[in-house]
């Protein structure tokens, strides 16, 4: 008989279900199976002892080899016993079992059959060794189950199961436990309790709690028997596709074991919940669902930082352990930069603001293995991180901003943009054109933007594209002059600017009836062509928003409509918008207060436009009047800094407002910046353009009332783009000394007089400009909702913490302070803001002049400033661009020059 292997997983003598129960019974002293049966002697190899290990009713032959000193070690036997438990009965193993087991040798000749094994020399060839759990094992020992954490790359959004916050980043966002499958931040790895509940990978029983250096059995020494191979077919690394592949497959555990023992002895009390505002996407730690909203999304325990919904709070167990610290470091999830509200706060706003953030504030792409290595000592045990190197301040301090990060404030439909068009219809079809009378057969595929003629139904190669925006008309058969003699006529015609497509083939005298499948694959027949005509006609229709009322009839989109041309003030009746513009339903540019904005294209010129579609039946009369107010205001505004309204179409059910299409908005520019905020020189460039557009509005007694980065559009993707104001749904006609009281705008950017339902005037826009400057330079909102704005303004440390305001000039802070004035009479006007030293910058003036030269229109700067800046450049030794020199400017201080300058200055301040 050959010698047994060094260690082999046991082959249970009972079925699997009974074996697990037997293992649990085996770990109690005196529960052995009784006298050992006769064991056949096994021939031992040189330098080894062959014997059997018995755990419950499972018995395994093992081989004990000599160590490097030539002796036998009892530690080897303990190691074998723990390995068998980990492989065969992982649900029965626990951390530190190595120190909690006793070994007994069966001696049939003795009155006491079980003899305690005190040394490896007590084990003889062919003995049966019983593994028994010591009475020193406590209930807490069974509860301590450390996690096996590995760096993981997630392909879908995931949340930390300790703090509830989202795992940020593109790759290696966090750690995943291979035992229970839970996910954690790298920063939370040192705080999570050792409570792994999984059995995917349990190889921790052979670790000593006393620090004894144990010998781990290498994977090369393990051999599995044939019946057990199906259990071990999939390695732990194969169970998690996103796990980082490591050569040594080293795992990491959570907080120190002795701390878990201390915490288990503590008295558990009910949680103390307070309403909380979260700055990052967070899930409820009870139901694992997202805490929705922008502010006051849920409740958080003041002591242990447990997060949950308000509806889930009564169901949360009373298991709060309070604030747990070790070496001054808080082990409960940190407050980070969140804002704690009072208990009495209104929780209904979370339902009104249930839009999820569209933009992420950071992307963590770090090597977690290096971070873990820094926190390990030589023995491989986890050490507490250096508090000086913590990446997040856990308490509110003047050094770090505690304000809400800048985000897109959603008030209506969530901003979405689908990248790929959905196929509306596909199939074989034949056609010929006005330039080529040869009838061709292709596989047609219709989506929301074009008709693509593919070579076949499986490949990606195509013959031609027919953009829907280029289709001028879709009509039945009009002419048969191009039909060859004896050929069947076509079914319908697609007319574009350059060519006419004659589609389909109407078989007049079919030779024999064809089965349906051959008709579909051949692309001929009046029925097949009719289906294509209806599908294309439907694709050319204006977009019908979800939830809108839909009438009956195939020509619903050709209801009597009125087209109002803003440029020439012409009104045309019975004009269908689909004959002039093509609307792309899958290109959602955004949403305003009264409708969704889609991308579109002018059919004849190919010019890109933005089309706002409003379903009138969804809105009450008051909101419909606000829409008309927006159109009426835009009709009277013609300024390069204001978005251009081309025309408006109106049907009994819907209104289509056609505007120029721009590149993006200012908020997208801020959030996509490297630091999540803009440099000062770019902010000056953008703010100056906003102020010039506001000056034009205020000159016409128009107050925007909803000024925010989302409503500042960029004309291009250039680093220094032209900007235009849009979304005048809340705009009001307010005289110089007039006041209004109706509630308008977005709360995050509104002045306090509006929030308090007091009268407001045109200075309302100037408060919004101050907020825009603040969020552009810092990437956060300036105020918290739970504190009085006046008190926050007085607290300079709160308003301007060193991070990031230490990098920002004092002139910028001074301008913000003069704009964010609670008293309206102290708030800066447009011209006073433009004259502030922060905006009177030579480089900003040069950038604006370059923009004006590029556009071909001077509307931001004034000629009266040319001489002043040219003189400034000479005094400072700066090079003045030659192409910006104004030839009409005179360098002599003649009375005529002074009179001209005074006249120009009078024009500039005439609106004050």
From Swiss-Prot:
Q: Which Pfam families match?
A: C1_1, PH, Pkinase
Reactions this protein catalyses: L-seryl-[protein] + ATP = O-phospho-L-seryl-[protein] + ADP + H(+); L-threonyl-[protein] + ATP = O-phospho-L-threonyl-[protein] + ADP + H(+)
Q: Where is this region: Disordered?
A: 377-402
Q: Name one GO molecular function term.
A: identical protein binding
Q: Which GO terms describe its cellular component?
A: autophagosome membrane; cell cortex; cell-cell junction; cytosol; Golgi apparatus; nucleus; perinuclear region of cytoplasm; plasma membrane
Q: What does this protein need as cofactor?
A: Mg(2+)
Enzyme Commission designation: 2.7.11.13
From the UniProt annotation, give the residues forming the signal peptide.
none
Per the record, the major location class is cytoplasm
Q: Which GO terms describe its biological process?
A: angiogenesis; apoptotic process; cell differentiation; cellular response to amino acid starvation; cellular response to angiotensin; cellular response to endothelin; cellular response to hydroperoxide; cellular response to norepinephrine stimulus
Q: Which CDD domains match?
A: C1_PKD1_rpt1 (cd20839), C1_PKD1_rpt2 (cd20842), PH_PKD (cd01239), STKc_PKD (cd14082)
Query: Per the database record, which ranges form the PH domain?
Result: 422-541
- Consequence the record notes for mutating residue 502 to E: Loss of activation
The highest taxon in the source lineage is Eukaryota
Keywords attached to this Swiss-Prot or TrEMBL record, sorted alphabetically, are: Angiogenesis, Apoptosis, ATP-binding, Cell membrane, Cytoplasm, Differentiation, Disease variant, Ectodermal dysplasia, Golgi apparatus, Immunity, Inflammatory response, Innate immunity, Kinase, Magnesium, Membrane, Metal-binding, Neurogenesis, Nucleotide-binding, Phosphoprotein, Repeat, Serine/threonine-protein kinase, Transferase, Zinc, Zinc-finger
Concerning what turns on (or off) its expression, the entry says:
Up-regulated by the intestine-specific transcription factor CDX1 in an activated KRAS-dependent manner in colorectal cancer (CRC) cells.
Binding residues for ATP: 589-597, 612
Q: What would changing residue 432 to F do, according to UniProt?
A: Decreased phosphorylation level when coexpressed with SRC in HeLa cells. Unchanged phosphorylation level when coexpressed with ABL. Unaltered kinase activity. Decreased kinase activity
The UniProt family comment states:
Belongs to the protein kinase superfamily. CAMK Ser/Thr protein kinase family. PKD subfamily.
Describe its function.
Serine/threonine-protein kinase that converts transient diacylglycerol (DAG) signals into prolonged physiological effects downstream of PKC, and is involved in the regulation of MAPK8/JNK1 and Ras signaling, Golgi membrane integrity and trafficking, cell survival through NF-kappa-B activation, cell migration, cell differentiation by mediating HDAC7 nuclear export, cell proliferation via MAPK1/3 (ERK1/2) signaling, and plays a role in cardiac hypertrophy, VEGFA-induced angiogenesis, genotoxic-induced apoptosis and flagellin-stimulated inflammatory response.
Give the linked disease: Congenital heart defects and ectodermal dysplasia: An autosomal dominant syndrome characterized by atrial and/or ventricular septal congenital heart defects and variable features of ectodermal dysplasia, including sparse hair, dry skin, thin skin, fragile nails, premature loss of primary teeth, and small widely spaced teeth. Patients manifest developmental disabilities ranging from motor delay and delayed speech to global developmental retardation.
Name under which the protein is recorded: Serine/threonine-protein kinase D1
Q: Which organism is it from?
A: Homo sapiens
